[in-house]
Amino acid sequence: MSTYFPKGEVARKWFVVDADGQTLGRLASRVARILSGKDNPKYTPFIDTGDHVVVINAEKIKITGLKADNKKYYHYSGYPGGMKEEEFLKRLERRPELILETAIKGMLPKSKLGKAMGGKLKVYRGADHPHIAQKPEVLANA
């Protein structure tokens, strides 16, 4: 049996996902799967065959349980005393796009290929986005 190599150029589609009322982890895993190309029949682990995904209404994402009160995001600057923490609800107010980006990119490979996959993710607060020229398909049941 021989190894399958897809052609160099991959036809990439654009999808738009509405995060309104969606659960954070379930939406993130679905989007990560599309970005990595695992929904594509020509999927190859060492070639980026994923599609572009635009997520809108990031501020309307929901989470279950007590995570709204207990979940914290940490960032370390590398200096003594440089550990910063932010609660979920404060980050949802301040930068809801960052919550989705962090969740989705955490589900992608930690390599050059993973960075390329993460570069095809666009997250926006509100229903408007600047990618109308790409004619994205609405992704149902994301």
UniProtKB/Swiss-Prot annotation:
One of its GO terms (molecular function) is mRNA binding. GO terms for cellular component: cytosolic large ribosomal subunit. GO terms for biological process: negative regulation of translation; translation. Keywords: Ribonucleoprotein, Ribosomal protein. Coiled coil: none annotated. Disulfide bonds: none annotated. This protein is one of the early assembly proteins of the 50S ribosomal subunit, although it is not seen to bind rRNA by itself. It is important during the early stages of 50S assembly. PANTHER family: LARGE RIBOSOMAL SUBUNIT PROTEIN UL13M, RIBOSOMAL PROTEIN L13. Part of the 50S ribosomal subunit. NCBIfam families: rplM_bact (TIGR01066). Belongs to the universal ribosomal protein uL13 family. This is Large ribosomal subunit protein uL13. The lineage of its organism: Bacteria, Pseudomonadati, Acidobacteriota, Terriglobia, Terriglobales. The gene is rplM.
